[in-house]
């Protein structure tokens, strides 16, 4: 019995190691498949934004730009991962909830846009693609965006939503750069 129990333990251990190696391979495969879905996800974001774009751009009467070149530079730098994460969080938690309340006709469209952004965020987190989100530092450019947004008060929502297409372009730039690494 002692020998068969030892053999059984060894088989269980080997099965566990094999399963964990298979799981690791699946996670790595999922990671490598993420970039293939990027164009589709960006198209969905752009289509969802297209449903509210005119509304917010018509209401945005300000000449200044909220999403500046310094934010794009952070997206291109080693802080790109954090800048992307912080900007997604900013739009989901600060901008979109306020934008939904501006007109009942656009509420569902803004909500749909938010769901698409959440899907992107979930894909980044659940896949644990460290190649795409490898760092933990804070982005100064994102802090500047948030500060400018706050100073604009009610007009900040129009400004941030009217520039959402710029944000999508920055996401695309960041992800395209990361795929090449």
UniProtKB/Swiss-Prot annotation:
Glycans are attached at residue 137. It is found in: Secreted. GO terms for biological process: antigen processing and presentation of exogenous peptide antigen via MHC class II; immune response; interleukin-10-mediated signaling pathway; negative regulation of B cell proliferation; negative regulation of cytokine production involved in immune response; negative regulation of inflammatory response; negative regulation of interleukin-6 production; negative regulation of membrane protein ectodomain proteolysis. Keywords: Cytokine, Disulfide bond, Glycoprotein, Secreted, Signal. Residues 1-19 form the signal peptide. GO terms for molecular function: cytokine activity; interleukin-10 receptor binding. GO terms for cellular component: extracellular region; extracellular space. SUPFAM superfamilies: 4-helical cytokines. This is Interleukin-10.
């Amino acid at each position: 019995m002692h020998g068969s129990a030892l053999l059984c333990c060894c088989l269980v251990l080997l099965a566990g190691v094999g399963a964990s190696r298979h799981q690791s391979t699946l996670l790595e495969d999922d990671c490598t498949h993420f970039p293939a879905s990027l164009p589709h996800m960006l198209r969905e974001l752009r289509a969802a934004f297209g449903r509210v774009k005119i509304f917010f751009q018509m209401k945005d009467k300000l000449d200044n730009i909220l999403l500046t070149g310094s934010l794009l530079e952070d997206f291109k730098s080693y802080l790109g991962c954090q800048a992307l994460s912080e900007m997604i969080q900013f739009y989901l938690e600060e901008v979109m909830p306020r934008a939904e309340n501006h007109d009942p006709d656009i509420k569902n469209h803004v909500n749909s846009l938010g769901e698409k952004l959440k899907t992107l965020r979930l894909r980044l987190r659940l896949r644990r693609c460290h190649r795409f989100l490898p760092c933990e530092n804070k982005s100064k450019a994102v802090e500047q965006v948030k500060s400018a947004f706050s100073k604009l008060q009610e007009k900040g929502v129009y400004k941030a939503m009217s520039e959402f297409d710029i944000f999508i372009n920055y996401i695309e730039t960041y992800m395209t750069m990361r795929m090449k690494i």
